[in-house]
């Protein structure tokens, strides 16, 4: 069924948004098979973003853990410092093709906001970024960067003032400005066609990783690990391997202060179905079906839902989803990788690194793990120092 992954996905939106989604899907279906559009997209990915990103053998980490061979997919080396630009670039080119003059986006950690503002600056489009007031405090450097790029950062004061509320506000704004405005949704969630569209703009990660590991090792990996908030970097690296049953796909969610505390963002771990931002997926909710606040030290993971394709992969057991606490992410992810490889990962990516550290030690040396380093950690220095200061 269109826009569905089994029962997950769909378009649970008011009529005003429905018309915009129909227009968007129509435009997207035209460009995805349009050689000129895809060539332009690949040109900017290669020469503006700096793709392909390397698949790096983490020799020190591998030796230190004494188990599986670990490779890092270096999305942190992209222009703007994360995987987000792969999608922002594709969608802004689509907005341009549709004749839209303005783009809007939501952002949590600020990486998607920076990526959207960057590409909007490049193509001369007006840009408005919706960001929860709480995240504005946590990510001051990214806010300044967006403003420097010419974007207007709109503080969202509703709810708990984080990513969830920013998405709600962006959709609301889009519904009443649809004639000249394009909404660049930052993750593989929301109503159809966004989950499919974002995945297809992020699959370049997995397409490259597949080619690279075959060149380096002559075979596919045994495990692929990626952090999961909304889930776009993870679905991007997973998708080209979905039909390779021998490759274990593991998404790593944020366990925050511990699942038992209720202060976490482990949506799939909790496995409760609900409707959020126009999609049916797993959603953190209370006994009355109200959406709960998600929590993580990582501003990019504290989303109370997850992309519908991840819900589908979890339900069909094609992928498994684990969770890592703030403490593990900081010490066994962020600090560990920085010290041992000289690579500072984003706090989001640090969750996957920390799980890789656990997993690698249980495997033999003939096994191969690829970890998606979805972004770099410069933006997280303040959060990590504050966390360590509190300890």
Curated annotation (Swiss-Prot):
<dbReference type="Pfam" id="PF00291">
    <property type="entry name" value="PALP"/>
</dbReference>
<dbReference type="GO" id="GO:0004834">
    <property type="term" value="F:tryptophan synthase activity"/>
</dbReference>
<keyword id="KW-0822">Tryptophan biosynthesis</keyword>
<dbReference type="InterPro" id="IPR001926">
    <property type="entry name" value="TrpB-like_PALP"/>
</dbReference>
<keyword id="KW-0028">Amino-acid biosynthesis</keyword>
<comment type="function">
    <text>The beta subunit is responsible for the synthesis of L-tryptophan from indole and L-serine.</text>
</comment>
<dbReference type="InterPro" id="IPR006654">
    <property type="entry name" value="Trp_synth_beta"/>
</dbReference>
<dbReference type="InterPro" id="IPR036052">
    <property type="entry name" value="TrpB-like_PALP_sf"/>
</dbReference>
<comment type="pathway">
    <text>Amino-acid biosynthesis; L-tryptophan biosynthesis; L-tryptophan from chorismate: step 5/5.</text>
</comment>
<keyword id="KW-0663">Pyridoxal phosphate</keyword>
<comment type="similarity">
    <text>Belongs to the TrpB family.</text>
</comment>
<keyword id="KW-0057">Aromatic amino acid biosynthesis</keyword>
<protein>
    <recommendedName>
        <fullName>Tryptophan synthase beta chain</fullName>
        <ecNumber>4.2.1.20</ecNumber>
    </recommendedName>
</protein>
<dbReference type="GO" id="GO:0005737">
    <property type="term" value="C:cytoplasm"/>
</dbReference>
<feature type="modified residue" description="N6-(pyridoxal phosphate)lysine">
    <location>
        <position position="84"/>
    </location>
</feature>
<comment type="subunit">
    <text>Tetramer of two alpha and two beta chains.</text>
</comment>
<dbReference type="InterPro" id="IPR006653">
    <property type="entry name" value="Trp_synth_b_CS"/>
</dbReference>
<dbReference type="InterPro" id="IPR023026">
    <property type="entry name" value="Trp_synth_beta/beta-like"/>
</dbReference>
<keyword id="KW-0456">Lyase</keyword>
């Amino acid at each position: 069924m269109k826009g569905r992954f089994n029962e997950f996905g769909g378009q649970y939106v008011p009529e005003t948004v429905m018309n915009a989604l129909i227009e968007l899907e129509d435009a997207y279906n035209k460009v995805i098979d349009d050689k000129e559009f895809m060539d332009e997209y690949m040109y900017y990915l290669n020469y503006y973003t700096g793709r392909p990103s390397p698949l790096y053998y983490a020799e020190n980490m591998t030796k230190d853990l004494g188990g599986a061979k670990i490779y890092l997919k270096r999305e942190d080396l992209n222009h703007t410092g994360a995987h987000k630009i792969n999608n922002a670039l594709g969608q802004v080119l689509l907005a341009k093709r549709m004749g839209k003059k303005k783009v809007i986006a939501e952002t949590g950690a600020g990486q998607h906001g920076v990526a959207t503002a960057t590409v909007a600056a490049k193509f001369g489009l007006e840009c408005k970024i919706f960001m929860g007031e709480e995240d504005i405090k946590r990510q001051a450097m990214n806010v300044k960067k967006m403003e420097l790029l010419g974007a207007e950062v709109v503080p969202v004061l509703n709810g708990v003032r984080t990513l969830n509320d920013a998405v709600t506000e962006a959709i609301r704004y889009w519904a009443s400005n649809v004639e000249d405005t394009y909404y660049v949704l930052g993750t593989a969630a929301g109503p159809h066609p966004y989950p499919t569209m974002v995945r297809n703009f992020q699959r370049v990660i997995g397409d490259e990783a597949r080619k690279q590991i075959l060149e380096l090792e002559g075979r596919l990996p045994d495990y692929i690990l990626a952090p999961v908030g909304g889930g776009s970097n993870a679905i991007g690296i997973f998708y080209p391997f979905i039909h390779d049953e021998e490759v274990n796909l593991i998404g790593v969610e944020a366990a925050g202060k511990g699942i038992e505390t209720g202060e976490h963002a482990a949506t799939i771990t909790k496995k409760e179905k609900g409707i959020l931002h126009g999609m049916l997926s797993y959603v953190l909710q209370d006994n009355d079906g109200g959406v709960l606040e998600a929590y993580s030290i990582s501003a990019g993971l504290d989303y109370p839902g997850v992309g519908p394709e991840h819900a589908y992969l979890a339900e069909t057991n094609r992928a498994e989803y684990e969770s890592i606490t703030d403490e593990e992410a900081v010490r066994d992810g962020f600090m560990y990788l920085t010290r041992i490889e000289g690579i500072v990962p984003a706090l989001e990516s640090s969750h996957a690194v920390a799980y890789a550290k656990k997993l690698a030690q249980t495997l033999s040396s003939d096994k191969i793990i690829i970890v998606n380093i979805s972004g770099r950690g410069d933006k997280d220095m303040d959060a990590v120092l504050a966390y360590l200061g509190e300890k």
